[in-house]
């Protein structure tokens, strides 16, 4: 098994560089089913890059994340948390990374994730505001 960096995962979707896309696809095929590990940071960077650099819409980002999570070639870090984060991301205002880290934290036994992020605070019961100083 090998792990994939975000740029390799992105190249598999990118038609602007056919040579790198072909190399990334060949690498994944050569590893076989479950032979490529994608960790939580790569998933977050992937979603962020699609949104910020590629200017993709939330629906397309969600579809691409879902395709990664369901592809048999990939072993995903924290797959249950990633799936729950994706479900929240589809309908919520926060970034995928916010939901994913909060789901990981919840699985670790944390009641909430403290944040200053207003979108995350509006998003769900996974987050709580950092209290004001008295």
Indicate residue ranges for each PLM-predicted region.
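Short active-site oxyanion
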Residues: 33-36, 73, 107-112
């Amino acid at each position: 098994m090998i792990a994939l960096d975000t740029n390799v995962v992105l190249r598999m979707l990118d038609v602007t560089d056919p040579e790198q896309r072909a190399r990334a696809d060949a690498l994944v095929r050569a590893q076989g089913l479950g032979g490529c590990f994608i960790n939580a940071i790569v998933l977050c960077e992937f979603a962020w890059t699609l949104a910020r650099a590629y200017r993709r819409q939330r629906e397309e980002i969600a579809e691409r994340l879902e395709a990664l999570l369901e592809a048999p070639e990939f072993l995903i870090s924290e797959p249950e948390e990633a799936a729950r984060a994706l479900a929240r991301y589809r309908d919520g205002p926060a970034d995928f990374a916010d939901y994913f880290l909060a789901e990981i934290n919840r699985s670790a036994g944390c009641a909430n994730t403290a944040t200053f992020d207003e979108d995350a605070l509006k998003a769900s019961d996974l987050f709580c505001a950092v209290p004001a100083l008295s």
